[in-house]
């Protein structure tokens, strides 16, 4: 097969590319340039997609003896990931940019170009597994990335390969060391790659501006003012700007955000609990909408807790009823549905959470 190896410059994608070469495939490496302005993404020790990372990826490709290219997706990344991220926060939602990047960039824009150039599939360093077209959790539960891949359609999954999903992360590092790959001990990427400072609030404020509003309690009493709803997310406790402790002495958390009125409501930890929510749009990884309610498990954030639920399916929308209440569920987050079995949890589909 002719395989395009997406190489971030990290250890996982490097070993993934090496395994594709070992398997006898015709492999070409590509690094995605996602920033139009140099220095606006994290550097190699803190994240991905920097000039240093591109250089690391090129050196690994040279060691593997495969062609290597850098493809510029900066405009698509800004439009589909960064602008979407900013818009969501301005509307009081809490998005996951890694989910959006996989959906729109790595397995859409990149994969589309790969197919147009005659490649059969795109291989990445994601920790997940594909078995008979079914997306499953990785062997390494701590590194599992099936959550951020739960938005992929059947067509996208058919042209994807995850060569490291069957291995624990320590084994991947050991293999990289054994192969003599210079990235064997390179730190994992964390946080949001397009916010170099790590200050999400400042990043959003510079792009959204000031729209003052009130922080209120359950009965509508004003407790504080704020400069914009982008400063908050459901479940947030710190940085609320409250003038003093609540009468009962208990901490307060953000329980709802109304972007139209710029009102942020706070309450107790118990007020964060929810038992049901909606989700749209919906992706079913099999391409088929279940004909009846399904018993499954749901996860609402990367590496978050998993709870049992009953999901009423639909082609455009789902309704989730939880067996155990969850706290801090925010509109804009992605809910991923899993079916547990002996082969490893299977991803059934996903949706963007709505609270109505």
UniProtKB/Swiss-Prot annotation:
Where does the record place the catalytic residues?
101, 193
Q: What does this protein do?
A: Catalyzes the 2-thiolation of uridine at the wobble position (U34) of tRNA, leading to the formation of s(2)U34.
Cystine pairs annotated here are 101-193
Identification of the protein by name: tRNA-specific 2-thiouridylase MnmA
Supply the InterPro entries for this chain: MnmA-like, MnmA-like_C, MnmA-like_central, MnmA-like_central_sf, Rossmann-like_a/b/a_fold
Q: Which GO terms describe its cellular component?
A: cytoplasm
Species the sequence originates in? Mycobacteroides abscessus (strain ATCC 19977 / DSM 44196 / CCUG 20993 / CIP 104536 / JCM 13569 / NCTC 13031 / TMC 1543 / L948)
What's the superkingdom here? Bacteria
Which GO BP annotation is one of this protein's? tRNA wobble position uridine thiolation
Keywords carried by this UniProt record: ATP-binding, Cytoplasm, Disulfide bond, Nucleotide-binding, RNA-binding, Transferase, tRNA processing, tRNA-binding
> Which family does the similarity line name?
Belongs to the MnmA/TRMU family.
Please verify whether the record's keywords include RNA-binding: yes
The UniProt catalytic activity note for this protein reads: S-sulfanyl-L-cysteinyl-[protein] + uridine(34) in tRNA + AH2 + ATP = 2-thiouridine(34) in tRNA + L-cysteinyl-[protein] + A + AMP + diphosphate + H(+)
For this UniProt entry, the molecular function terms from Gene Ontology, in alphabetical order, are:
ATP binding; tRNA binding; tRNA-uridine 2-sulfurtransferase activity
């Amino acid at each position: 097969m002719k395989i395009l190896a997406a190489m971030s410059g990290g250890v996982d994608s490097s070993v993934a590319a090496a395994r594709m070469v070992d398997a006898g495939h015709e492999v070409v490496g590509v690094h995605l340039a996602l920033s139009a302005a140099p220095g606006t993404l994290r550097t190699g020790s803190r994240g991905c997609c920097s000039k240093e990372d591109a250089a690391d990826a090129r050196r690994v490709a040279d060691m593997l003896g495969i062609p290597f290219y850098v493809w510029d997706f900066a405009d698509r990344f800004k439009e589909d990931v960064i602008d979407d991220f900013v818009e969501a926060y301005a509307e009081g939602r809490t998005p996951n940019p890694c989910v959006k990047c996989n959906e729109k960039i790595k397995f859409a824009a990149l994969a589309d170009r790969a197919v147009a150039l005659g490649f059969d599939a795109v291989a990445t360093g994601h920790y997940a597994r594909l078995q008979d077209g079914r997306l499953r959790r990785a062997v390494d539960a701590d590194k599992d990335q099936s959550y951020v891949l739960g938005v992929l359609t059947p067509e996208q999954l058919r042209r994807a390969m995850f060569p490291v999903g069957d291995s624990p992360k320590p084994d991947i590092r050991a293999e990289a060391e054994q192969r003599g790959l210079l990235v064997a001990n390179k730190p994992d990427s964390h946080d949001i790659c397009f916010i170099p400072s790590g200050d999400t609030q400042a990043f959003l404020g510079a792009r959204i501006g000031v729209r003052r509003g009130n922080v209120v309690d359950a009965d509508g009493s004003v407790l504080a003012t704020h400069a914009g709803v982008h400063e908050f997310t459901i479940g947030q406790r710190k940085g609320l700007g409250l003038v003093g402790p609540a009468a009962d002495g208990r901490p307060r958390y953000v329980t709802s955000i109304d972007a139209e009125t710029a009102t942020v409501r706070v309450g107790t930890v118990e007020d964060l609990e929810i038992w049901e929510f909606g989700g749209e749009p919906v992706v079913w990884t099999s391409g088929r909408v279940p004909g009846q309610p399904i018993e499954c498990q749901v996860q609402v954030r990367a590496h978050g807790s998993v709870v049992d639920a009953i999901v009423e399916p639909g082609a455009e929308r789902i309704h989730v009823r939880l067996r155990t209440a969850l706290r801090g569920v925010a509109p804009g987050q992605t809910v991923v549905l899993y079916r547990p079995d002996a082969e490893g949890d299977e991803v059934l589909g996903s949706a963007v959470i709505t609270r109505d």
